[in-house]
């Protein structure tokens, strides 16, 4: 696995692979990798001949009071994980390499409806930052396919819409959420949890799972169901950002008649914000 830091080096390496007839896959990350990221890269290696991973902590997608300055930087460990997972090329640009003209006047990519509400409500500008950096990476690499985790369900929906609407010839693949044995979705931010918070954290997915089970059993009153689960989470020590049942494609509010929904949640334990979801399709 080679590691490059400049767009010029990245494009040259990808061009060599493409000249050899190789199918190119891209997996963007912010580093501090865990086994969920490794699963994305391993899936990319199954689907393509040449796997590009990126590690870039993107300032555009962090709000003013978020953890940009403290987000863990673990490059050496990340390189080892990527190598073991089957990565061929790692791109680790600086902020100056990604935004050579500064960020104040940077062209932004906006996916209006899907970026609003849910995480977009509490993290204004976040999805513009995500869509902008991902579109830049897509232009730099021009992959045949790109793989993203379904844990960030709203992000995946935003990227799918961007690719569709801007006619990008890239296949977007969602990979199922990787979980700890107790059900907690793996996240780079789980390391912020103290021992007591880590013990409480699986209750978030349990509430989502119970919501899905109730819907599958025929529950029609979504409002009452969500109110009950919010109270359950608050009793477990969570501060709720949102717990919603939405249409799985549009992410718009939905009703019990909808057979394809997603249950999405974001909640704080202490200062750590956890997100999770469950896609529920009923026949």
UniProtKB/Swiss-Prot annotation:
Signal peptide location: none
Q: So where does ATP get bound?
A: 30-37, 149-152, 178, 186-189
Under the heading SUPFAM superfamilies, the entry gives:
Nucleotidylyl transferase
What are the BP-aspect GO terms? pantothenate biosynthetic process
Q: Name one GO molecular function term.
A: pantoate-beta-alanine ligase activity
| Active-site residues, record numbering mapped to chain | 37
Q: Which HAMAP family match?
A: PanC
Its protein name is Pantothenate synthetase
Can you name the source organism? Pseudomonas savastanoi pv. phaseolicola (strain 1448A / Race 6) (Pseudomonas syringae pv. phaseolicola (strain 1448A / Race 6))
Query: What gene is it encoded by?
Result: panC
